[in-house]
């Protein structure tokens, strides 16, 4: 498996805190004095990571023009989680909150959804292997460290995985514009998985049919839908609100 690149202060910090053994080397902007960056560089050196100073143009080229904040790191790939890891993840949570993404293939959207999931205390994000954005430096950067903290589980058969979750007592709600009730009318407490479909196409038919319930976000304006990362944030934090209120 090939090595990966991560860039940006948040992404590098997250790996450094959780899995420092993954670092191979780091590239830093020559002459940069940054109060947020210097502690990271010191810690990288303490764990034996080689630092190479580079010009801004060289770093920009390595990051393909994205905002690298003066640091890029080459790391060993993270362990890939699959359906066999789900039971261990669920066992760590009394009432797990899960996010299922069906067909989210844009890396910016996946990264933003991971960031939402981290903020909402989601136990895991579940995606299908064949219809999801791969883990890239862009996903990691947009996630601001959440790609390194939130378990991302890639499954072979999403509908089968959903049925397994249901057997474990997890209620699964899918988001769909044609749903008859909205997220503010739905009960989003207890062991719960929220399913978000691809922007435009929504959930695939079998995914939709496997859900226990369908809900929608009430829309008062002219647009008919929201970006999937925005929609996931709204749904997750309505679930968080209800869960806090029920304590």
From Swiss-Prot:
The keyword Cell wall biogenesis/degradation does not apply. It catalyses: guanosine(2251) in 23S rRNA + S-adenosyl-L-methionine = 2'-O-methylguanosine(2251) in 23S rRNA + S-adenosyl-L-homocysteine + H(+). Its EC number is 2.1.1.185. GO terms for molecular function: RNA binding; rRNA (guanosine-2'-O-)-methyltransferase activity. It is found in: Cytoplasm. Gene3D superfamilies: 3.30.1330.30, 3.40.1280.10. Belongs to the class IV-like SAM-binding methyltransferase superfamily. RNA methyltransferase TrmH family. RlmB subfamily. This is 23S rRNA (guanosine-2'-O-)-methyltransferase RlmB. It comes from Vibrio vulnificus (strain YJ016). The gene is rlmB.
């Amino acid at each position: 498996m090939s090595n990966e690149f991560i860039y940006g202060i948040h992404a590098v910090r997250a790996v450094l805190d959780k899995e420092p053994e993954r670092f191979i080397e780091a590239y830093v902007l020559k002459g940069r004095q940054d109060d947020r960056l210097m502690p990271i560089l010191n810690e990288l050196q303490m764990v034996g990571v080689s630092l190479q100073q580079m010009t801004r143009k060289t770093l920009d080229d390595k990051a393909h023009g994205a905002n690298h904040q003066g640091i890029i790191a080459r790391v060993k790939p993270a362990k890939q989680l699959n359906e066999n890891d789900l039971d261990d993840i669920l066992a760590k949570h009394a009432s797990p909150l899960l996010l299922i993404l069906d067909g989210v293939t844009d890396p910016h959207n996946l990264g933003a959804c991971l960031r939402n999931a981290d903020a909402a205390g989601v136990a895991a994000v579940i995606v299908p292997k064949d219809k999801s954005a791969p883990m890239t430096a862009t996903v990691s950067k947009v996630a601001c460290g959440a790609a390194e903290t939130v378990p991302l589980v890639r499954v072979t058969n999403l509908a089968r995985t959903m049925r397994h979750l249901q057997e474990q007592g997890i209620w699964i709600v899918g988001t769909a514009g044609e749903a008859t009730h909205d997220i503010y009318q739905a009960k989003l407490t207890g062991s719960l998985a929220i399913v978000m479909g691809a922007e435009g196409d929504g959930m695939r038919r079998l995914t939709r049919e496997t859900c226990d319930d369908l809900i929608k976000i009430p829309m008062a304006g002219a647009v008919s839908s929201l970006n999937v990362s925005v929609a996931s944030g709204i749904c997750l934090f309505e679930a968080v609100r209800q869960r806090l209120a029920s304590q």
